């Protein structure tokens, strides 16, 4: 017998921020597989759209730039990303982390906006 289990149903990002209204415009769904090598920090960035991820294997942290806030995620976890907050992912472990990231976007919208000016102050 087939079953369905809801693994995430929320109106908040992982840090408790309320999600914005959906974007207006021609829809485009993007699904990416992300591989984060061991001991790797991703660049600082933010998203202007909602995104969701499922951790297939490994573990990582999401760290907010302007707040002393971070959260740990591991294989089997799901998360709803922040919108508009500068953050980065950090794989502090000795193993690769694999995620599938879902972006309900609109045509030609960037999935993330880099903040290279933040790299100096890490």
Can you annotate each of these PLM segments?
Residues 1-33, 72, 79, 115-122:
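A short, N-terminal "cap"/entry segment at the start of jelly-roll beta-barrel domains
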Residues 24-27, 39-52:
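A short beta-loop-beta micro-motif enriched in histidine and acidic residues
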Residues 31, 50, 84:
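Short coil/loop residues immediately preceding or within conserved phosphate-binding loops
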Residues 36, 66-84:
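Short acidic-glycine-tyrosine-enriched beta hairpin
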Residues 47-67, 77:
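Glycine- and acidic-residue-biased ligand/ion/polar-headgroup-sensing regions
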Residues 62-64, 87, 109-113:
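Substrate-binding/catalytic groove segments of enzymes
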Residues 69, 83-109:
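Ligand-binding loop in jelly-roll beta-barrel domains
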